[in-house]
Each structure stands twice: as C-alpha cells, then as structure tokens.
Amino acid sequence: MRKLIVGCGYVGRRVAKEWLDQGHEVSAVTRSAENANTLRSLGIEPVIADITRPETLAVIPAVDTLLYAVSHDRSSGQPPRATYVEGLNNFLKYSPNLPDRMILISTTSVYGVDDGSEVDEDTPTAAATASGQANAEAETDFWRGYWRNHQESRIGIVLRSAGIYGPGRLLRRVSSLQNQEPISANPDGWLNLVHVDDLVQSVLQAELAKEPDTYLVCDDRPIQRREYYTKLAELTGAPPPVFHADGQETSQGKRCSNRRLIETLGVKLRYPTIDDGLPHAIHSTT
C-alpha cells in the first residue's frame, strides 16, 4: 500500500520507518531539495511541494493513507494560523488526490482549561494560546473540508497529542537543569506527556479505525511539573529544579484522559508513565 506523510519530522520519520518495515511504499512532502536527499537515504520518496504555496500541490500523489503531521516553525516569522489553518486548507483544496483515510496530528493545547480539572474528547475546546486556537480551527476545517461531504467513503482521524518526549527531545531541558536556570511556571501545575513511540503506535492503530473520531494521545498519568523535572534531574545527574517563585505563574493546567485511546482505539502503551519512558528516552539519546 502507498502512504504519504505531510510533515515528516520527529514523529513522521518514525511512522515512515514503521510503514517501510511493513513493506509499504512511503512518500513525504518536503520544500527543500536538501531534505529530499535525506528522505531518499531513508527509503522515503520525496514530493517537492509547499502547503503555503497552492500552486505546488498539484504533484501530490494518490495514496491509501495520509498522515498530516505539520508543525509550526517559530523562526518563520509567520503566525501559527498560517501553518495550521491556511496550510491545511490549501492542501485540502488544491491536492488532486485525497485518500480514503487521513490522520491529522493536533494538540491538547486546543483546551483552555487551567484549573487542574480533567479533560477528554468531549470537553469543549477553548484554547488560550495562538497555537492552540489555530489547531482547534484546523480541526474544524479538517472535518468540513476532508470528511463532511464524503462520509460514505472517507475515514478521518484526529489525534490530539500531549507533549511529546523521546530520544533527542530532552537535551534542552537537561541543559537548563544542569545550568540551574529557573523554570518560570507553577511547580504544582499539571503536565500531560506521551512518548514518541506511543504516538507512533497511535498513528498505526488509527489506520485500523472503522469510524472517524478524535482521540487524546497521552500516557496514563498526568504529572505535576515539579515531579517531572525532579525525575529528569535525578536520571541525568543534574541539580534539583529551581522554580521562579514570583507568584505570577499560577495556572494549574489540565489533566488529560486517554480512556478513549485505550478502550476504543485499542492502543497498548509501551511507556504508560514517565517512570517507564524517561529512562528509555535518556539512554537512547546520543
């Protein structure tokens, strides 16, 4: 079968490897010739296109499954909406081939909850950040543009990812701990995390879903910020975390539930908590 990835970065390349190992043909959209060569070296067929330039999207190939995992480049000078909303709408409108199954990676920041309460897929979205607002709008446009007029033939899946960690994604935080840089956030606020391998497994499981749906992708246990950074410091030999106690950072965050992910989508987490996942991520980082 043929697969296409739009946004073949930290998560996308890991999904691509799984698909290649299963014997599928995998293509990925990229804007750069240099990155195209890198993709070829990984066994991935590059497709030179840019979601912000509709005229380039005519080359999108016909595939069986599409993973849309675009992230916003903060150095681009563009607002998140340009990437998440305008880019997605360009893709849906101007791509000549949309598959019968499309998986959209979104984020748990679509929720504006900051009182420490639990959220699930039925909790109303009311994002507090520009990125969260853009992702919430993109989800709405995804259902309208991809699925609404093709309900008999298409299955759309939205995966709202918690904060992703894994090999190579902890270096900046470890460096900050080692330098004893103050953390400007409420130490008692809640964090929701997922190991990258479990997000990849969620994508693979979403290929088997028989109905369109939205899933929160997070591990089994929300964790308070102080516990997370203390654990990270212990595992890396860094000093204990220092929090900036100016009284301004009072948000309690939210606690995400993965019940639907586990019970309905059938994902079996490899790393149910950071006690399982952090040691792997640290030891696998080169």
Model feature map: region roles:
Residues 115-158:
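Catalytic helix-loop patch of NAD(P)-dependent Rossmann-fold dehydrogenases
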Residues 173-182, 188-215:
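Alpha-helical substrate-binding/gating segment
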Residues 12-13:
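N-terminal Rossmann-fold NAD(P) dinucleotide-binding loop
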Residues 89-130:
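Conserved Rossmann-fold NAD(P)-dependent oxidoreductase catalytic core, especially the SDR/UDP-sugar
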Residues 200-252:
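Mid/C-terminal beta-alpha module of Rossmann-like enzyme folds, strongest
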Residues 145, 155-191:
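NAD(P)-dependent short-chain dehydrogenase/reductase
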Residues 61-103, 137-140:
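NAD(P)-cofactor binding segment of oxidoreductase domains
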Residues 45-52, 249-286:
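C-terminal amphipathic/interface module of NAD(P)-dependent oxidoreductases
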